Regions:
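ATP-binding/phosphotransfer module of carbohydrate and carboxylate kinases, centering on a glycine-rich
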Residues: 2-148
Length: 148
């Protein structure tokens, strides 16, 4: 009921929280809910991007780091749910959010390890793709076609 609306028309989708636009929205929500100091307060809230949050976090901004903690933990928990029925060898992330590096990866792994069934702990690798986003999508589709 209180979940975020997603661009697909549903509510509560992972995309609404763990995408670049999701990070920007989390920033706006956290700025509105608290009076904690943050570099992000110097910006127009409606124009904040995930890049702004990343820059602030890299400058030691605690609120910006908390935004990535929230996002990464949520994505890590989703990976834990996915592992329960698929037992993947690896989770490979690509796209603009991966430029956040450890700001995102550390909380992803924490969220995963705190949420995943114990039999899956330490089994999956967590990697950032070195491919550009559009290349990854085309190559993934090609690989599926090749197997058919």
């Amino acid at each position: 009921e209180n979940a975020r609306p997603c661009g697909c028309g549903r509510k509560g989708c992972l995309e609404a929280y763990c995408s670049a636009t999701g990070v920007a929205r989390t920033a706006r929500e956290m700025l509105a809910k608290t009076d904690r100091p943050s570099i992000l307060r110097e910006l127009d809230p409606e124009k904040i991007t995930s890049l702004d949050v990343s820059i602030a976090a890299n400058k030691g901004d605690k609120l910006a780091n908390d935004i990535y903690e929230f996002t990464g933990h949520m994505l890590g928990e989703a990976c834990g749910d996915f592992a329960a029925f698929s037992s993947p060898e690896a989770f490979i992330f690509f796209g603009g959010m991966t430029k956040a590096g450890d700001l995102l990866m550390k909380p992803i792994m924490e969220g995963y390890n705190n949420h995943v069934l114990s039999i899956f702990k330490g089994k999956a690798k967590f990697l950032f793709s070195s491919l550009e986003g559009s290349s990854a999508a085309v190559l993934g589709a090609s690989a599926i076609g090749w197997d058919l």
